[in-house]
Structures are given as structure tokens and as C-alpha cells.
From Swiss-Prot:
Record GO terms (molecular function): ATP binding; ATP hydrolysis activity; ATP-dependent peptidase activity; metalloendopeptidase activity; zinc ion binding
Protein name (record): ATP-dependent zinc metalloprotease FtsH
InterPro entries assigned: AAA+_ATPase, AAA_lid_3, ATPase_AAA_core, ATPase_AAA_CS, FtsH, P-loop_NTPase, Pept_M41_FtsH_extracell, Peptidase_M41
E.C. number(s) listed in UniProt: 3.4.24.-
UniProt topological domain (Periplasmic) ranges: 26-104
Cellular component aspect of the GO annotation: plasma membrane
Gene that specifies this protein: ftsH
Superkingdom as given in the UniProt entry: Bacteria
Length: 639
């Protein structure tokens, strides 16, 4: 019986109970208007001629008196045959009604109040269940079933993570042909843990595995287990695995498993809490699987360091698949997947876009394609152009433009020199990344941005690279001192980042005269998920040496940038003027300014246009005396 039929039957039952209840009350109200008299009084009144008419219904007599036409009723014995003779002799009108109907109707009328109360109770329970309270289903799993009839996701929809797909293809073979592996003594993996940064496609990979294997897919979040009531989490875990076994072979996917799988005993309020009971039940269920159940648990997290060791051991999560950010070839594949539904102009080169987006995750690339489509729609274009994608990339990297933010002329001048200081140091220092764009249009929380993109993906960086970044960060403050003869708060974030970078070089990377040593043991709480303190495991003298080394690194970068900007004052003035005139200059503009060439006149729309990624790759390639650059990993430098 489906839910629609159940609903109809339920409301028909409610209507019948209401009718019964109405008849009971109607009968009670009619009876209350009649005067109840004794049988002897009834006979006496009949013999005296005071009764006008009567109606005989079984063992009851209803009638009216002649005076005032008052109504009465009386119970009469069934074995009193003289009753009709007395009534006829005294000229009383007699009406007899048959009472030979079904006795069930009388029984229903008698029990109708109880039935109505039961119906109301069921109605209230249904209302509570259909609302947010779930009064009787707290212990039920909230997993959503993605059945085989729904839209499938396959490996064709997943790109840029070839290694992860290869790892998961064996899982598909296990689900399709489990007997093939069991004949050779192989054991089907009980769990697969997907580990990687946010936005890399862990959830999409899990759905693709279910789609390729053509099996049911249960999806639930780690936060859906624990509620305010004790024992609910463990009950939901049991119910989840019971559903999985009924639909085997299947996949159970738990997203953000760190919400329920954190290290036990690390809570600030003690070790015996509801989350730990849920984790214990999860451990028992995973360890209790039989080899031929055909239920595989897939979980995803970006914090594997906080998970309980018992959850990660072989026999529970047998495999750990790392899903990282895609490389340049992977980014091109991801862009092709997301661009299938987008009409592209002829000038769009996805390979160039992939080269210009190092460090982007799959979600970032999908967002960029979507923003490009929205940009084209706002301009009433029928196709998405390369300029739309470049604008979308800038929006993803630097934030949306805040053109409505009003800045005074003096604030614009300060921002122009500040960003020019960053750009000149980045363009004339070796070991730096290519500049992409400089703007004094407020974006995000910054009044201006100097943006650069690495030529290739970086996995490790050198000491020379970090020293170059320190010099670039100091460029904004130095430009204010040399050309404006004052300091502003705009350099606050630059100084903070430079200090943090220099301290890491000394205390973590061993890039100082103190040698390859680590100073300051971090104190982390698994419950909080991040460090809350730093244990000082060195002496006062060592602390002074650390401070001296940090200051030495920052001072050296400061002196180098000061000398560079002081020697190139004409270029600084020219770049600041170009920024004040155009608000945004791209890679070609920066190259022409440094080479002493005049910039082309402004376009009618105002502005020098948007830089393409080809420009980014061509700007001031590193040479023996200077290189092209910017801030690390495409991070914008706030003014």
C-alpha cells in the first residue's frame, strides 16, 4: 500500500469517527430534552388520559403529554401485553418502530468516543513525525538512497584525479565480480577513505564508483548521526548498516567523517560522550562485516590527522586514497568536463586557462566556468569568450570588484604607489613568479591587489624563493616611505605575513644560522582541530637568537627592496600614474612600463583590457639579472 492510499484510508477513518461522535452527541442532546418517568407513573398518566401520543422503539417508549405538549420517555418491560390495551382504551396514538437492525451499529455508537480518541492520538503522532520532531524515528538513519534509476555519475564525469580513479576501479570490480576475487582467497575491502583538500571531488568520486558498479548508493553526513538525545547516534549507525545489508551489494558513503570519527578521549569535557558512543558503534559495525556481504563503506575527509587510529587500521578502512588538486593536464580535463554545457567562442583555449590556474581545485574550476557563463549572460552574448573566463578567474582569485566603494584621490594615490611597490620588486627580483595583473579597484577586503600566477605547480620552494617573497611583501611599505614620505595601515597585512614567513623559515624550515633545528612544539587539540598553543622548548638565549634571525631576514629583504625601488623611481612614478589613469594594468602594460615604452591609448570603454594567460607566461622571464614575479601561489597582496 503506497503512501497516497494510506493517507486516503486514514482520513476516511477520521471522517467515520467524527460522524459516529456526532450521532452520539445528537442522541444525547435529544434524550436530554425528554423527561424520564417511571413505568408506574406512565400507566397512571395513560389511564387518566394525560398522554397524547407515544412511539414504541423496542423496550423504550417516547411520547408527549396533552398539557403543554411536554416530551417524556420511559423504559417498559417486554413481557407486559396489557400495555397496548391501556393505550387504546385511553385514545393514545401509538406508533411502533422496528428495532431489528444490526447490533454492530449500536456497538459502534457505544464505542465511538473511544475510537475517536484513538484516531486523534494517531493523528497527533503522524503530525509529529511529518514535522521536524521525528518523535518516534530518532534512531532511524537519515541516509539518502541514490538508486540505480536515478541519474548516474560515472568516471566520465570525473577528471583530473586519474590516480584516485585507478585505485577505485578495483572497488568496482569487487562489487561486480566478488566471486572472482574470493576464489583466490582475496578479501573484499571493507572501507575506503578518500583524503584530500576541499573541492577536489571526493564526493563525486564516491558517486561515480556507485554509478560504475551499478549498485545502490547510501549517502549521509558525519554530522547526521549525533543528536541531543543519548543513544541516537549509535542507533542510527546500526540502522544505516542494516539498510546497507538489505540492499547489498551497495556503497555506504559518509561525508566529513571527522565529525563523528575524531580521536576518542580528546574532548575537553571528558571521554564519555555521545560522539564517542557513535564512533564505538561504527567501529563495531565495520569490524562485524562478513566477507561476502558486498557492503563497502566509503568515507571522505580533509582532516585525516584527527581521526581515531582504530578507525584507520586495516580491516576497517583498508585503503586510503589521496585526492589532490589537479595538475595542468588534470585542470584542462576538468575544464573540458564543465565546459560541455557552455557554448564557447572560438578564441577560448582551455589549455591556456589550465596553465593560468595553478593551485585551483575542481570546485574552483567549476566556479570559474560558471562565473564566465554568468558574465557572458550579463553582457547579452550568446557564447562565452576568453575575456569572460579571464574576468571570472580574477573574481575567483581576488574577489569581486567593489566599484561602488568611494575612495578619495589621496587614498587612490597611496594605493597606486603601494601596489606599484609590490609590482616593481616582483618584476625585478629573481626566483619570483610571473605577474598577472595590478589593480587599485577594491576587491574583496583589499583596496588594491597585485596578482601573479606561478608558471607551473609548486610542491616545494627554495630559500631564495621565500626571501624573494619577503622582499615583495616589503615593497608596499617601502614605496609609501620613499614616494609619500609617510606610513599607512595598508601594509599591516604585508608585515604580518612577512613576519610569519620569516619565523617559519627560522623555527620550522631550518633556513637560518641556527641550523636545521625545529623550535616550538605545537600543542594541538584533536577536539578543536587546530593548534591552540605552542610549547616553548628552548631557553631565553635561544629565544633571543630566534628573534634576531627573524629580524635579520626581514631587514635584509627590506634593504634589498629599498635599494631596488630607490634606483627605479622613474619607473615607479610611471606605473603609479598608469594605475591612477587606468585603475588596472595587465602583464603587457607592466612589461612596457619597465622597458620605458609608452602605453597605448585607453580604449573607449576605459581601461587597458584584461590580460590573457599568454601574457602571464611572457612577462619578464627570469634571467641572470632579473626575473618576473609576484606573491606565492597567486595570492593577492592587499593594499
Amino acid at each position: 500500500m503506497n503512501s497516497t492510499v494510506k493517507t486516503i484510508v486514514f482520513w476516511v477513518f477520521i471522517l467515520a469517527c467524527c460522524i459516529l461522535l456526532w450521532q452520539v452527541f445528537q442522541r444525547s442532546s435529544n434524550t436530554g430534552k425528554e423527561q424520564e418517568i417511571s413505568f408506574s407513573q406512565f400507566l397512571n398518566d395513560a389511564q387518566q388520559g394525560q398522554i397524547h401520543d407515544v412511539t414504541v422503539v423496542g423496550g423504550e417508549v417516547h411520547g408527549h403529554f396533552r398539557s403543554a405538549n411536554a416530551a417524556f420517555h420511559v423504559e417498559v418491560p417486554t413481557n407486559y401485553p396489557q400495555l397496548y390495551d391501556i393505550l387504546n382504551k385511553n385514545h393514545v396514538a401509538v406508533t411502533v418502530k422496528d428495532n431489528s437492525g444490526s447490533p454492530w451499529w449500536s456497538i459502534l455508537i457505544q464505542f465511538s468516543p473511544v475510537l475517536v480518541l484513538v484516531a486523534l492520538w494517531f493523528f497527533m503522532i503522524r503530525q509529529m513525525q511529518s514535522g521536524g520532531n521525528k518523535a518516534l524515528s530518532f534512531g532511524k538513519s537519515r541516509a539518502r538512497l541514490l538508486s540505480m534509476q536515478q541519474k548516474k555519475v560515472t568516471f566520465k564525469d570525473v577528471a583530473g584525479v586519474d590516480e584516485a580513479k585507478e585505485e577505485l576501479k578495483e572497488i568496482i570490480e569487487f562489487l561486480r565480480e566478488a566471486q572472482k576475487f574470493q576464489k583466490l582467497g582475496g578479501r573484499i575491502p571493507k572501507g575506503v577513505l578518500l583524503v584530500g583538500p576541499p573541492g577536489t571531488g571526493k564526493t563525486l568520486l564516491a558517486r561515480a564508483v556507485a554509478g560504475e558498479a551499478n549498485v545502490p548508493f547510501f549517502s549521509i553526513s558525519g554530522s547526521d548521526f549525533v543528536e541531543m538525545f543519548v543513544g541516537v547516534g549509535a542507533s542510527r549507525v546500526r540502522d544505516l548498516f542494516e539498510q546497507g545489508k538489505k540492499n547489498a551489494p551497495c556503497i555506504i558513503f559518509i561525508d566529513e567523517i571527522d565529525a563523528v570519527g575524531r580521536h576518542r578521549g580528546a574532548g575537553l569535557g571528558g571521554g564519555h560522550d555521545e560522539r564517542e558512543q557513535t564512533l564505538n558503534q561504527l567501529l563495531v559495525e565495520m569490524d562485524g562485516f562478513e566477507a561476502n556481504d558486498g557492503v563497502i563503506l566509503v568515507a571522505a575527509t580533509n582532516r585525516p590527522d584527527v581521526l581515531d587510529p582504530a578507525l584507520l587500521r586495516p580491516g576497517r578502512f583498508d585503503r586510503r586514497v589521496v585526492v589532490g588538486r589537479p595538475d595542468v593536464r588534470g585542470r584542462e580535463e576538468v575544464l573540458r568536463v564543465h565546459a560541455k554545457k557552455v557554448p564557447l567562442a572560438e578564441d577560448v583555449d582551455l589549455r591556456v586557462l589550465a596553465r593560468g590556474t595553478p593551485g585551483f581545485s575542481g570546485a574552483d574550476l567549476a566556479n570559474m566556468v560558471n562565473e564566465g557563463a554568468l558574465s557572458a549572460a550579463r553582457a547579452n552574448r550568446k557564447v562565452v569568450t576568453m575575456q569572460d573566463f579571464e574576468s571570472a578567474k580574477d573574481k575567483v582569485l581576488m574577489g569581486a570588484e567593489r566599484k561602488s566603494m568611494l575612495l578619495t584621490d589621496e587614498e587612490k594615490r597611496v594605493t597606486a604607489y603601494h601596489e606599484s611597490g609590490h609590482a616593481i620588486v616582483a618584476a625585478m627580483r629573481k626566483h619570483a613568479d610571473p605577474l598577472h595583473k595590478v589593480t587599485i579597484i577594491p576587491r574583496g577586503m583589499a583596496l588594491g591587489v597585485t596578482m601573479q600566477l606561478p608558471e607551473e605547480d609548486k610542491h616545494t620552494v627554495t630559500k631564495d624563493y621565500l626571501e624573494t617573497q619577503l622582499a615583495i611583501l616589503m615593497g608596499g611599505r617601502i614605496a609609501e616611505e620613499i614616494f609619500l614620505h609617510q606610513m599607512t595601515t595598508g601594509a599591516g597585512n604585508d608585515i604580518e605575513r612577512a613576519t610569519e614567513m620569516a619565523r617559519k623559515m627560522v623555527c620550522e624550515y631550518g633556513m637560518s644560522r641556527l641550523g636545521p633545528l625545529t623550535y616550538g612544539k605545537k600543542e594541538e587539540q584533536i577536539f578543536l582541530g587546530r593548534e591552540i598553543a605552542q610549547h616553548r622548548d628552548f631557553s631565553e638565549e635561544t629565544a633571543r637568537q630566534i628573534d634576531a634571525e627573524v629580524r635579520s631576514l626581514v631587514d635584509e629583504a627590506y634593504r634589498a627592496s629599498y635599494q631596488l625601488l630607490n634606483d627605479n623611481q622613474p619607473i615607479m612614478h610611471k606605473m603609479a600614474a598608469a594605475l591612477l589613469e587606468r585603475e588596472t594594468i595587465d602583464a603587457n602594460d607592466i612589461r612596457m612600463i619597465i622597458e620605458g615604452k609608452d602605453l597605448p591609448p585607453l580604449k573607449p570603454s576605459g581601461g587597458s583590457g584584461t590580460a590573457t594567460t599568454d601574457d602571464v607566461q611572457q612577462v619578464l622571464k627570469p634571467s641572470s639579472d632579473r626575473g618576473a614575479g609576484g606573491l606565492p601561489e597567486g595570492s593577492p597582496s592587499p593594499a
